[in-house]
């Protein structure tokens, strides 16, 4: 990699995207269980793109996946800050969600990692205040 070239000037993170295979199943998880509200949605030829505005961040889910963009527990993790960690864990357990990392308390937060219906890792998080 060359080091004497102009730097890319990133101004913000536009969105984080998760590929999904079954859009209705994904919507049941993100909208029904997590309570996210759709900000933008479009469909073309049976392929969907849905965005959720969360604070100053956007999460996109899409079944417009390809060989290069597949669901994986090994990819990046979006961490959702929740109002009440214990209640969130109870709701996820009641919803039958698989926990990849069981709920734990650290010196700075409480957190757990769950799997969405396609196997993407999602963190539930609450900062100690």
Regions found by a protein language model. Give the residues of each.
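Vicinal oxygen chelate
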Residues: 1-15, 37-83, 87-117, 126-129
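Conserved beta-strand-loop-alpha-helix junction that forms the acyl-donor binding cleft
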Residues: 20-23, 44
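Alpha-helical macromolecular-interaction surfaces
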Residues: 24-25, 87
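Conserved active-site tyrosine of GNAT-family acetyltransferases
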Residues: 26-31, 92, 119
